[in-house]
C-alpha cells in the first residue's frame, strides 16, 4: 500500500460541471513510490495568482481536513480563522467547478466524518489506495501536485466502493497497519477524498486494523514521516505519453514490488495491469537510452515538473509553516496519483535557490535527496529511472539538485525554474567572482561547491616593487613577516593540480595514498605551539591520488575530517604558494585532498631548491644525531616539568659534568651582568639606511717624534671637516683620535722604506652604546722617490661591505697617484650618493683629467656576510679540533685572544671566526688588530675578541688577564685555556660538525661538476653551511615559539622553546647559550622586525622544519624509558 502526504496542497471545492479543471501548483512529499499514471488528453493551463485562493483552518478541527494553497497571495483569505462550530469557508476558483460538493448540510457532513474517524487506523506504514480517474478528472494537470484530503462523502456512492475495495483488500497477503484511501467520487464534477477508518461513510475502502481504536488522525506524525523518508516515482517520458492517444486514459495505481497484484476493482475499471507498471516504463526508458546513447535525455513537456512561463513569472514557493491539524495527499505532477515529485524533476537550482537552501536551518526540512548518478560521458537520465531511498541531514544537501520529496528548500519565496530541454551545463562561478570578492575567507560555506577555476581567482596576488608577490589577506590578521623572503618565492608550476578533480564521483570509495611523512609534518610546523601535537597527525588522512578536493558536497564528512586551525604565523613560502595555487587558508576550506596536493608540491619544490652539498651536510648531521628533534609539550607539562627530568642521566652524563654545567651557567650570568647591553648590527643598519654611505674618510701618516727616533700615526687629511662643535662632533673627534692607532697598530716598528706592496685590512670600532663602525684601510707608499714612510687611506662606515669599499679605495688610490686634489671631489660625490639596498647598485659620476666624465658603479651584494671572509687562512692556521673549541668558547661569550706575526693574518682569522657565528652577531668588544698602546683592554672583565701581534706577547703575559682563551695562530696551539672547551657543545652535534669539516675537500669535489649553486661549491660556502646547520639543529625551531600579544607585539616563549628539544645535552647547551647577548639580540631582532628580506638561515630553518619527523613515544615506551633511567641512576649512586 502507498501513502503520501502533501504539505503544500490546495483545497478546491465547487459545484458540478464537466469543464476541464485548471491546475494548481504545490510541492509535496512522499513516503513511497507513486503510481505511474497516464497523462490527460485535455489541455492543461496553469492558474494565475488571481485564480488561486487558500483557506486557513484551526488546528483543533478534527472533522474537516483541509489544506491551504501554498501559492495563495490573497491576504484576506489567509487571514480567515473560522470557528469550529461553523462550516469552513469554501475556496472557489472563479466560476469553474473543481469538484463535486455534497449538497447535504454541513452538519450532516461533520457527523459522517466523525463516523469515519472512529474506525481509522492510526499508524502509517504504507499508503493509500488510489482509485482510477476519468479523463476529465481534476488535479491531473501536468503541473498539479496536490490532491484533496477530505472526510466528506456520501453514503450513496460509498457502499459499492466499500464492497469492491473490501474484495480487493481481501486479496492482500498482509494487512497494513494503516491505510489511507484516496477516493474519486463519480459524478459530473469529481472530488477526491481521503478518509481514515473503514466504517466511515466517506471512505469505505479499507478493512479496519486492530489498532484503529483511536479516532484522531495523527497528521504531525504523517508530517514527520513524509519529511524523513521518501521513495521517489518517475513519470513517463513524453514519447510514451504521445503514444497513447487512443487508449483509455484512466489513471491507475501500481502497487510496490513485493505486494500482490492489483485488485478486482482496478480490473473492473478497465485498467491494464502490465502495461502501466513502473517496471515496464523503466525498462522502456532504459532500452531507449541503450539504443540511442547519443540522443541524451528525452525532451519533457514544458508543463512537466514545473509551471510554464506564465505561471513562473508570478508564482512563488509556498512556505513551510502549516497549521497543526492539516495534511494533504498530492499526486505527482506527471503521474497524477497519490505520490510525490521525483527528486530530479527539475533543473538544478540557480544561485538564489542555492543560497536560500544553504541558509535553511536543520529544523526546517530534512528532506532526502537522490544520490547523483555515476559519472559517465553521457548525460544522466532525468528523471533517474531507479528510485532509491536516501536520508540526509539538511547540512548535507547538494544545492545542485532539488529535494526528492518536492518540498521547497526554505521559507524564502523563490520561483521554481523551468526544466531545460538539454542537460544543464557545468556550473562556473567566474562571472560572479567580483560579486562575492568581499566575503571573508572564514565564511566559506557558500563556496563549498565551487569549481577549481573559480577558486584560482579568489585570492589574486599582486606583484610588489621587489618583483615578488605580496601575501594575500587571509583570515588571520597577522602572518610571519620574518619569512618574507625575497629570493625563494618560486614561479607557479605549469601543470594544473586540479585537472583530475572528480566532480561527480564524490561518494565513491576513496582510493587513497597516505600523505608522505615529510609533507604531513610540514603541515604540523605551520601550526601554533598550542595547536601543534607532536605525538600524532591531526587525523589519519585517507587521500586520493586524484584530488577531488574542492567539490566535496558532504559537509558532515568535511566536519568529521576537519583540520586543526592554522595559526596566525604561516610560513611565507607556504602562503605564497598557496596563494598561487588559489587555495584558501581558512580551516573550513582546506580539506584533505587539497592539503595532499599542496604539501607534496611544496616539498617537491623545496627538495629541488636545496643544493646537493647542503643535502650531504644534512645527512651527516642526521646520521650523528638521529631523527628525534622535538618532543610533545603541552602548556601544563611546560609549567610542571621537573628538574629530575631535566637532569636525569639518560645520555651517560656524569655528576661532574652536571656540576660543570651549573658553574658555567652561573659564570656567564654573572659576567653578562657587568657587560653593557648591545644592539644587533641589523638594527643599527636599519636606522642608517636613509643616511650617507660613509661617515669619514681620513688619510693617516706617520710622523716622527722630536725627542725620540720613533713615529706616531696622525690624521693628515680628513673629509668632511668637523666644523660645528656639537655633541656628535665631539664624539666623532674622540673616534678620530682612536682611528690612527688602528691604522698603524705597529707604528713603533716602522722605518722609511723604498718599496712596499699595498695591503688591505679592516677593523671595527664599538661605541659605549654598542654602536659599531667598520674601518676599511689601504696601506701603501705615497708617490715619490727614495725611502719614505707608508700612509693609510681609511673609510669609516656603518655598512659592513668589504668589496664595495675596496672598490672605493682602488679609485682613491688611482686619483691620489695623479694628484691629492682629485680625491676631494670624488669623495664628495660619493657621500651624496644614496645608501644602497641589498642587491642594488648606485652610480657615482666623477670627472678625471685626461679621461673626462666617468661613472663608477657600486653594488651592494644580497648577502655580504662572507664577502671579506677568508676561511682558507683560518684552516691554514688552525686544525678542525682547535677551531671547534674556539667556536664553542665564542658561543658562550668568553674572552678570546689571537696572536699572529702578520697584520693580515690577524685580521683575516678574526673576521672569519666571527663569520662562523652567523646568524648571530658578536655583541662585545671586537678588535681584529689591537694596537700595542691599547693592550690594557685585555684586562677588562667583559667578553672580547682581540688580535695581537707577536711583538706584544711578552707584555701580554705580564698582565693580570682573567679567564681567557689565548690562541697562537702561527703554531696552532693554545697559550692559555680553561680545559672544558671540548664539553661546551652537545657531543653528537660536535661530532657531526667535526666530521663535516674534516671531509670538506671531499664534499666540494663531489659537487664540482654538478649544476648546483656556485656559492656552495666554494670553501667559504661549505664551511658556512656546516655551521649554519649546527644552529638550525639547536635553535631552528625558534619561530614556532614566537607568539603575538593583544597589542600585536611579538613575544618569545623561552622555556617552551628550550623544553621542546628532545635531547637533554642540547637543552643544557641552550640553557647557557640563551643567557648570552648574542641570542638575546637575535630574538630581539626577530621580535621587532616587521617586513624584511630574509637570508640564508631562514631558508635552511624552513627546510629543517619540513624534515622534522613525528617521533613522540607511546605512553608505555615512555614509562619503560623512565624506569630504565631510574635504574641507571640508582646503579651509579651505588
Swiss-Prot record:
Residue intervals of the uDENN domain: 695-843
Modification Phosphoserine, positions: 30, 32, 230, 365, 542, 571, 619
Positions of region (Disordered): 1-90, 233-273, 289-571, 633-658
Keywords carried by this UniProt record: Cell membrane, Cytoplasm, Endosome, Guanine-nucleotide releasing factor, Membrane, Phosphoprotein
GO molecular function terms attached to this record: guanyl-nucleotide exchange factor activity
Modified residues (Phosphothreonine): 228, 361, 479
Localization per record: Cytoplasm, Cell cortex; Cell membrane; Recycling endosome
Signal peptide: none
Comp. bias regions, Basic residues: 429-443, 559-570
Subunit structure: Interacts with ITSN1 and GRB2. Isoform 1 interacts with the SH3 domain of ABL1.
Pfam families assigned to the protein according to its UniProt record, in alphabetical order: dDENN, DENN, uDENN
One of the GO BP terms on file: positive regulation of ERK1 and ERK2 cascade
Comp. bias (Low complexity): 315-348
Bias-annotated ranges (Basic and acidic residues): 249-259, 389-399
Identification of the protein by name: DENN domain-containing protein 2B
Recorded GO CC terms: cell cortex; plasma membrane; recycling endosome
Amino acid at each position: 500500500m502507498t501513502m503520501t502526504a502533501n504539505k503544500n496542497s490546495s483545497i478546491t471545492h465547487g459545484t458540478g460541471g464537466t469543464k476541464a479543471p485548471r491546475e494548481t501548483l504545490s510541492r509535496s512529499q512522499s513516503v513511497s513510490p507513486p503510481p505511474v499514471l497516464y497523462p490527460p488528453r485535455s489541455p492543461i493551463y496553469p492558474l494565475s495568482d488571481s485564480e488561486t485562493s487558500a483557506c486557513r483552518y484551526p488546528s483543533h478541527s478534527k472533522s474537516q481536513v483541509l489544506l491551504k494553497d501554498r501559492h495563495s497571495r490573497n491576504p484576506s483569505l489567509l487571514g480567515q480563522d473560522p470557528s469550529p462550530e461553523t462550516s469552513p469557508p469554501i475556496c472557489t476558483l472563479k466560476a469553474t467547478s473543481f469538484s463535486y460538493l455534497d449538497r447535504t448540510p454541513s452538519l450532516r457532513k461533520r457527523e459522517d466524518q466523525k463516523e469515519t474517524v472512529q474506525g481509522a487506523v492510526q499508524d502509517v506504514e504504507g499508503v493509500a489506495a488510489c482509485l482510477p480517474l476519468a479523463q476529465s478528472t481534476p488535479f491531473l494537470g501536468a503541473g498539479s501536485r496536490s490532491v484533496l484530503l477530505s472526510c466528506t462523502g456520501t453514503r450513496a456512492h460509498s457502499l459499492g466502493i466499500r464492497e469492491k475495495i473490501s474484495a480487493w483488500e481481501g486479496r492482500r497477503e498482509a494487512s497494513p497497519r494503516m491505510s489511507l484511501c484516496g477516493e474519486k467520487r463519480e459524478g459530473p464534477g469529481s472530488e477526491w477524498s481521503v478518509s481514515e477508518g473503514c466504517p466511515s461513510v466517506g471512505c469505505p475502502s479499507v478493512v479496519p486494523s486492530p489498532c484503529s481504536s483511536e479516532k484522531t488522525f495523527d497528521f504531525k506524525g504523517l508530517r514527520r514521516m513524509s519529511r524523513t523518508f521518501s521513495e521517489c516515482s518517475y513519470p513517463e517520458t513524453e514519447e510514451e505519453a504521445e503514444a497513447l492517444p487512443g487508449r483509455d486514459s484512466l489513471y491507475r495505481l501500481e502497487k510496490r514490488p513485493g505486494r500482490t497484484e492489483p485488485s478486482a476493482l482496478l480490473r473492473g475499471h478497465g485498467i491494464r495491469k502490465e502495461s502501466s507498471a513502473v517496471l515496464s516504463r523503466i525498462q522502456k526508458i532504459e532500452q531507449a537510452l541503450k539504443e540511442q546513447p547519443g540522443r541524451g535525455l528525452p525532451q519533457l513537456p514544458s508543463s512537466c515538473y514545473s509551471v510554464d512561463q506564465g505561471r513562473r513569472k508570478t508564482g512563488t514557493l509556498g512556505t513551510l509553516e502549516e497549521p497543526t491539524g492539516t495534511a494533504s495527499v498530492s499526486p505527482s505532477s506527471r503521474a497524477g496519483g497519490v505520490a510525490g515529485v521525483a527528486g530530479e524533476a527539475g533543473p538544478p537550482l540557480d544561485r538564489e535557490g542555492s543560497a536560500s537552501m544553504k541558509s535553511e536551518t536543520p529544523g526546517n526540512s530534512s528532506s532526502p535527496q537522490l544520490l547523483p548518478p555515476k559519472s559517465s560521458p553521457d548525460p544522466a537520465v532525468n528523471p533517474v529511472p531507479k528510485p532509491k531511498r536516501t536520508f540526509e541531514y539538511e547540512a548535507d544537501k547538494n544545492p545542485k539538485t532539488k529535494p526528492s520529496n518536492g518540498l521547497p528548500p526554505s521559507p524564502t519565496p523563490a520561483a521554481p525554474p523551468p526544466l531545460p530541454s538539454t542537460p544543464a551545463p557545468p556550473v562556473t562561478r567566474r562571472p560572479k567572482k567580483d560579486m562575492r570578492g568581499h566575503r571573508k575567507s572564514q565564511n566559506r560555506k557558500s563556496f563549498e561547491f565551487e569549481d577549481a577555476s573559480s577558486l584560482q581567482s579568489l585570492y589574486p596576488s599582486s606583484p610588489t616593487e621587489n618583483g615578488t608577490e605580496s601575501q594575500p589577506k587571509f583570515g588571520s590578521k597577522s602572518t610571519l613577516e620574518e619569512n618574507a623572503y625575497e629570493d625563494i618565492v618560486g614561479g607557479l608550476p605549469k601543470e594544473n593540480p586540479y585537472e583530475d578533480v572528480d566532480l561527480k564521483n564524490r561518494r565513491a570509495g576513496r582510493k587513497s595514498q597516505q600523505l608522505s611523512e615529510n609533507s604531513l609534518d610540514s603541515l604540523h610546523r605551520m601550526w601554533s605551539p598550542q595547536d601543534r601535537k607532536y605525538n600524532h597527525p591531526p587525523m589519519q588522512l585517507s587521500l586520493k591520488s586524484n584530488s577531488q578536493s574542492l567539490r566535496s558536497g558532504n559537509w558532515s564528512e568535511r566536519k568529521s575530517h576537519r583540520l586543526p586551525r592554522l595559526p596566525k604565523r604561516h610560513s611565507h613560502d607556504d602562503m605564497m604558494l598557496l596563494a598561487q595555487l588559489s587555495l584558501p587558508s581558512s580551516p573550513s576550506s582546506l580539506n584533505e585532498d587539497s592539503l595532499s596536493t599542496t604539501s607534496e608540491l611544496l616539498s617537491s619544490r623545496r627538495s629541488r631548491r636545496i643544493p646537493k652539498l647542503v643535502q650531504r651536510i644534512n645527512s651527516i648531521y642526521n646520521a650523528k644525531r638521529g631523527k628525534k628533534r622535538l618532543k610533545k609539550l603541552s602548556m601544563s607539562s611546560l609549567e610542571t616539568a621537573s628538574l629530575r627530568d631535566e637532569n636525569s642521566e639518560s645520555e651517560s652524563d656524569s655528576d661532574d659534568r652536571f656540576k660543570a654545567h651549573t658553574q658555567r651557567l652561573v659564570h656567564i650570568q654573572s659576567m653578562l651582568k657587568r657587560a653593557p647591553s648591545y644592539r644587533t648590527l641589523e638594527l643599527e643598519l636599519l636606522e642608517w639606511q636613509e643616511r650617507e654611505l660613509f661617515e669619514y674618510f681620513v688619510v693617516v701618516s706617520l710622523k716622527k717624534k722630536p725627542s725620540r727616533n720613533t713615529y706616531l700615526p696622525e690624521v693628515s687629511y680628513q673629509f668632511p671637516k668637523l666644523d660645528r662643535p656639537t655633541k656628535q662632533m665631539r664624539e666623532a673627534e674622540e673616534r678620530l683620535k682612536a682611528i690612527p692607532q688602528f691604522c698603524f697598530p705597529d707604528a713603533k716598528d716602522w722605518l722609511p722604506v723604498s718599496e712596499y706592496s699595498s695591503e688591505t685590512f679592516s677593523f671595527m670600532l664599538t661605541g659605549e652604546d654598542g654602536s659599531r663602525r667598520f674601518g676599511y684601510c689601504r696601506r701603501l707608499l705615497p708617490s715619490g722617490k727614495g725611502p719614505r714612510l707608508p700612509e693609510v687611506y681609511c673609510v669609516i662606515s656603518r655598512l659592513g661591505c668589504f668589496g664595495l669599499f675596496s672598490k672605493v679605495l682602488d679609485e682613491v688610490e688611482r686619483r691620489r697617484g695623479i694628484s691629492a686634489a682629485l680625491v676631494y671631489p670624488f669623495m664628495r660625490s660619493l657621500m651624496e650618493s644614496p645608501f644602497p639596498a641589498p642587491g642594488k647598485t648606485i652610480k657615482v659620476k666623477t670627472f678625471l683629467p685626461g679621461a673626462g666624465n666617468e661613472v663608477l658603479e657600486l653594488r651592494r651584494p644580497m648577502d655580504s656576510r662572507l664577502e671579506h671572509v677568508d676561511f682558507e687562512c683560518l684552516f691554514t692556521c688552525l686544525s678542525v679540533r682547535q677551531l671547534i673549541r674556539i667556536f664553542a668558547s665564542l658561543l658562550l661569550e668568553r674572552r678570546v685572544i689571537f696572536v699572529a706575526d702578520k697584520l693580515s693574518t690577524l685580521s683575516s682569522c678574526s673576521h672569519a671566526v666571527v663569520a662562523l657565528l652567523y646568524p648571530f652577531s658578536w655583541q662585545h668588544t671586537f678588535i681584529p688588530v689591537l694596537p700595542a698602546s691599547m693592550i690594557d683592554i685585555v684586562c677588562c672583565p667583559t667578553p672580547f675578541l682581540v688580535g695581537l701581534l707577536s711583538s706584544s706577547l711578552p707584555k701580554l703575559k705580564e698582565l693580570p688577564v682573567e679567564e681567557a682563551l689565548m690562541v697562537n695562530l702561527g703554531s696552532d696551539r693554545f697559550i692559555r685555556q680553561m680545559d672544558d672547551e671540548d664539553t661546551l657543545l652537545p657531543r653528537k652535534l660536535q661530532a657531526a660538525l667535526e666530521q663535516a669539516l674534516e671531509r670538506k675537500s671531499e664534499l666540494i669535489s663531489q659537487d664540482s661538476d654538478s649544476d648546483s649553486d656556485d656559492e656552495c661549491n666554494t670553501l667559504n660556502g661549505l664551511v658556512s653551511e656546516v655551521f649554519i646547520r649546527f644552529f638550525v639543529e639547536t635553535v631552528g625551531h625558534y619561530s614556532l615559539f614566537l607568539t603575538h600579544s593583544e597589542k600585536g607585539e611579538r613575544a618569545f616563549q623561552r622555556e617552551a622553546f628550550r623544553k621542546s628539544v628532545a635531547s637533554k645535552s642540547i637543552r643544557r647547551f641552550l640553557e647557557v647559550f640563551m643567557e648570552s647577548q648574542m641570542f638575546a639580540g637575535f630574538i630581539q631582532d626577530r621580535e621587532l622586525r616587521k617586513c624584511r628580506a630574509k637570508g640564508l638561515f631562514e631558508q635552511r630553518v624552513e627546510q629543517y622544519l619540513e624534515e622534522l619527523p613525528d617521533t613522540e613515544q607511546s605512553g608505555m615506551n615512555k614509562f619503560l624509558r623512565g624506569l630504565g633511567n631510574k635504574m641507571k641512576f640508582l646503579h651509579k649512586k651505588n
